[in-house]
């Protein structure tokens, strides 16, 4: 939008006012913002300006958009300590959040080239590929691809995979996650993950890649996770 030289653009002023209301607690986690039309009336401006203000707040991780429902104040981020042996469901409950995992697909397929080496497989070996969506308090926060070894977990697809995979491993195979190699870095949200999470393709995301080991020190599976950029923080205490 045009502005007088030296003046702060109106969309930044509106962003600052909304940000102040969020940070002061006047707008709390999970609160719904007024509609774009209502915000136009409140700030006496155009919808284009309001949308720019909202986009700035979304990029900052302060608000998020739910399809056909509007804009909401972003919940507090889940925090992950990579030194702790935990799983998504346990992590959520320990932080007072309600977890849910939904299985999108589960197939026996040829191992993708990019995970062949860490899983110690050969070309054309088979894996179970699970694609799952994880929710915290009803909000989709993570798109996960689980690459599982049929030799370690035969007939895996016969079980209910809409919950904790950790519990399935323990109850049906007597296998326990005990250690992992974790890498994480920012990336752009790929198309399939973006569609599942309800965000635009190419939006910022946090990618976590975990190579998991069981109680015998053997490779168990490999997870590739795409997290919404506003839903997770990683903390490590080295004391």
UniProtKB/Swiss-Prot annotation:
Pfam family, one: UTRA
GO biological process terms held by the UniProt record: negative regulation of DNA-templated transcription
Keyword Transcription regulation: yes
DNA-binding region ranges: 36-55
SMART domains named among the record's database cross-references: HTH_GNTR, UTRA
Domain HTH gntR-type: 8-76
InterPro entries, per database record: Bact_HTH_transcr_reg, Chorismate_lyase_/UTRA_dom_sf, Tscrpt_reg_HTH_GntR, Tscrpt_reg_PhnR, UTRA, WH-like_DNA-bd_sf, WH_DNA-bd_sf
Misc: Maps to a phosphate-starvation-inducible locus previously known as PsiC.
PANTHER family: MANNOSYL-D-GLYCERATE TRANSPORT/METABOLISM SYSTEM REPRESSOR MNGR-RELATED, TRANSCRIPTIONAL REGULATOR OF 2-AMINOETHYLPHOSPHONATE DEGRADATION OPERONS-RELATED
Protein's name according to its UniProt entry: Putative transcriptional regulator of 2-aminoethylphosphonate degradation operons
UniProt source species: Salmonella typhimurium (strain LT2 / SGSC1412 / ATCC 700720)
């Amino acid at each position: 939008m045009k502005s007088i030289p030296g003046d702060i653009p109106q969309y930044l002023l509106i962003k600052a006012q909304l940000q102040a209301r969020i940070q002061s607690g006047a707008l709390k986690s999970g609160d719904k913002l007024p509609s774009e039309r209502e915000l136009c009336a409140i700030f006496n401006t155009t919808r284009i300006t309001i949308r720019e203000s909202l986009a700035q707040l979304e990029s900052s991780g302060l608000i998020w958009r739910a399809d056909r429902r509007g804009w909401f104040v972003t919940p507090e981020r889940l925090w992950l300590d990579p030194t702790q042996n935990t799983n998504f469901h346990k992590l959520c409950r320990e932080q007072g959040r309600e977890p849910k995992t939904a299985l999108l697909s589960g197939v026996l397929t040829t191992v993708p080239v990019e995970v062949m080496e860490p899983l110690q497989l050969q070309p054309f070996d088979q894996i179970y590929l699970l694609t799952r969506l994880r929710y915290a308090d009803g909000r989709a926060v993570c798109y996960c691809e689980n690459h599982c070894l049929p030799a370690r977990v035969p007939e895996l697809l016969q079980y209910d995979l809409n919950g904790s995979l950790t519990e399935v491993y323990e109850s049906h195979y007597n296998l326990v996650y005990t250690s992992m190699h974790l890498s994480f870095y920012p990336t752009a949200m790929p198309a399939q993950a973006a569609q599942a999470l309800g965000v635009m393709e190419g939006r910022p995301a946090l990618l976590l890649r975990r190579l998991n080991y069981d109680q015998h020190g053997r490779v168990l599976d490999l997870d590739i996770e795409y997290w919404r950029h506003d839903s997770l923080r990683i903390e490590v205490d080295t004391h």
